[in-house]
Amino acid sequence: MAGTEHLIEVPEDQDPWPLLFEIADATREGTWVLVGGLMVHAHAIRAGVAPSRTTRDVDLLLDIGASRVSDVAGPLQSMGFAPLHANSATPLHRFTRGEDVVDVMVEPGIRARWSRRSVLVAPAARQALDRRDRYVLQGTTKSVRIAVPDPLGAIVAKAAAYHVDQRDPGRHLEDLAVLMASGGGRRALGLERLARRDKQHLRPALDALIDEGHDAWSVLEFGDRLVAQRARRAIAEAVDQPTRSRGATGKM
């Protein structure tokens, strides 16, 4: 559930974890939430589930309500990063430093700008910000504290990414399989919190995974696969239930 603190051990010498440690040290806590592939890895490590894939990028969802874009973009530049395609016609999205890549995004409806550029919008971002947990990442020599969407927030965010980003839909579905295996079941997920917009984000991905022979499930070991498929069924049942009028955490 949102607000919980977790301690996980991460391979501090394995990319891109060293970069995440560097960013956490350089930025103020609360200015961003970890999303994307490394978010999936954090949940998998917490739950003892094998991640489905390697990831090279660090994806940050900026909390503009608590900070400004410059609170993250400034430190990234100080670290030697430069924005990709630096012109006013394209949204700010990616910072690079050699082979290191950091992607930044904001929630819909936020008029966030940096260096006269708008910032890329991420679907289901508001609920991911609202449903954040705190993670202490313990490396071999140091630790950092960051924010990560809780299991439900991560699943909704990944389902939304699958719906809007069809460049590599299989990757998003594999990530969802891992997140469902890591979620802890119906009660731990807190499915009663699902709002109408959450359900809209979830339906396409749930439908895509209804076939238990889908390739996305094959990334999981047998026991984890059973747990994940049971979670998918529980989420699908919750999506089909009438939405409580007070459920507001999923609004964009």
Predicted regions and their residues:
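Compositionally biased terminal segments of proteins
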Residues: 1-252
